[in-house]
Amino acid sequence: MQIRQSVKFKKPLIHYITNPISINDCANMILAVGAKPIMAEHPLEVSEITSISESLGINLGNITDNKMKSMLISGKTSYEKKIPQVIDLVGVGCSKLRLDYAKKFISECHPNVIKGNMSEIKAIYGIKSSAKGIDVGECDIITEQNFDENIEMIKRLSMETDSVVAATGVVDIISNGTYTYIISNGCEMLSMITGTGSMLTGIIASYISSGNILEGTALAIAIMGICGELSQNVKGTGSFRNELIDNMFSISDDIIIKKIRINSY
């Protein structure tokens, strides 16, 4: 839990270029874990903003020409200055524009973390996926039957890109090619409100700011799942959203240790 307490103590500045659909919730979630968000996206200022930040988050949801330009500028600045960065592959399974752009970004900016659902991870690896818009396709969901082959693919992608790869879903797989974590926390309601994946990327950006990339990514994913579990006994999805942010703000180390379901592979 040292990573979590370090973020609360240091309050790192997190530059997150994300989509307008969830930008407010993303900023609030970064605040909830103790970091400070800045959501700048103008091409003429993003390099300067990234330079003074401790971490960078890149989200491919709802992209535009200007935002694509800004993301590449920030990504290159982050790489040059050794600032940790995470890219969220939103929609690369259903959009050639996003897929081609994501490949270019990974090649030129070398993000520390590549995050996506299994459809998005398969697409970036070069395997045909069955993505349903930005959601994971039914055929791509991790099952007992395809578990081992998906882990091997994730490990290979990690080694090829020199990035931690985080495949999120009912079961989360996080790997740096050598060490792999399997996380089984979460609940169905996390997929029933928009933006929870984008919020998670903001938390990952916050937790990797210390430079502990694999553990920071795994911790962020586990805590998001636990907070989902703690928040689900509510009237509906609107209440769930608010409860999720509240639990992220107030959750204790003791509850995390008690509820975390994580295994190494």
UniProtKB/Swiss-Prot annotation:
Top enzyme class: transferase
MF terms (GO), sorted A to Z: ATP binding; hydroxyethylthiazole kinase activity; magnesium ion binding
Substrates-to-products reaction catalysed: 5-(2-hydroxyethyl)-4-methylthiazole + ATP = 4-methyl-5-(2-phosphooxyethyl)-thiazole + ADP + H(+)
Pfam families: HK
InterPro entries: Hyethyz_kinase, Ribokinase-like
Cofactors (names): Mg(2+)
GO biological process, one term: thiamine biosynthetic process
Binding-site residues, ATP: 115, 168
Record EC number: 2.7.1.50
Metabolic or biological pathway: Cofactor biosynthesis; thiamine diphosphate biosynthesis; 4-methyl-5-(2-phosphoethyl)-thiazole from 5-(2-hydroxyethyl)-4-methylthiazole: step 1/1
Binding sites annotated in the UniProt record for substrate: 39, 195
UniProt KW keywords: ATP-binding, Kinase, Magnesium, Metal-binding, Nucleotide-binding, Thiamine biosynthesis, Transferase
The keyword Transferase is assigned to this record: yes
NCBIfam families, per database record: PRK09355.1
Entry similarity comment: Belongs to the Thz kinase family.
Task performed by this protein: Catalyzes the phosphorylation of the hydroxyl group of 4-methyl-5-beta-hydroxyethylthiazole (THZ).
HAMAP family: Thz_kinase
Protein name as annotated: Hydroxyethylthiazole kinase 1
Name of the gene this protein is made from: thiM1
